[in-house]
Amino acid sequence: SQNTRIQQDVADLDKASGMVINDLMYKHWDHYVTTAPHPFVATFNGNSITGAEDIMKGEPYECPMEPFGGVEQLAWSPDGTQIAYTCRKKAGLKYAISTDSDIYLYNLSNKTTRNLCKPDGFVAPEVKVTESLERQSINSPHSTDDYNMGYDQNPQFSPDGKYVAWSSMMRDGYESDRSRLCVYELATGKKTYVTESFES
């Protein structure tokens, strides 16, 4: 058979272009996804970099996020002790159908991370992956909980370091949702949407 011939003729192997795919998001628009970018913190003395540390070590997620994310998805606190970053911590099919990214706060001294968009222990409602997210409980218009289920990205600290602001969308799975400016008070966890009364 043809398969046997290829296996016997080693010279033909370099002509093969097959790939083993074990995750849904193996390609993003125009390129294959083979790695996940991570932010690193390091010491720079003007000539060399030392002590590089991956602030998302061991996590299979990306920051900045595909396809348009860049350095605007990260922010240093004014006192240099924390980094706010954007990430969608989902994998496989859940990643592929969701726009639910969050803002995370990494503490450089104790190396802990907390989600500013959702409370500790939050578990998103299960979704029916073959149906639109629009009318599922994850996007319920009757919910009084503010879990920032859509895109949350591009964090910035206030000059006094007391607040983090970011662009926020309300609904999961809806890339054209209206962007709101969310201002988060670090001391209390209170969120304020300062653009709610604006016309869009």
Predicted regions and their residues:
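Short amphipathic alpha-helices and their capping/turn segments at secondary-structure boundaries
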Residues: 1, 70-74
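Hydrophobic beta-strand positions that form the internal "hydrophobic ladder"
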Residues: 1, 80-83, 161-164
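Predominantly five- to eight-bladed beta-propeller fold
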Residues: 1-58, 86-89, 93-104, 137, ...
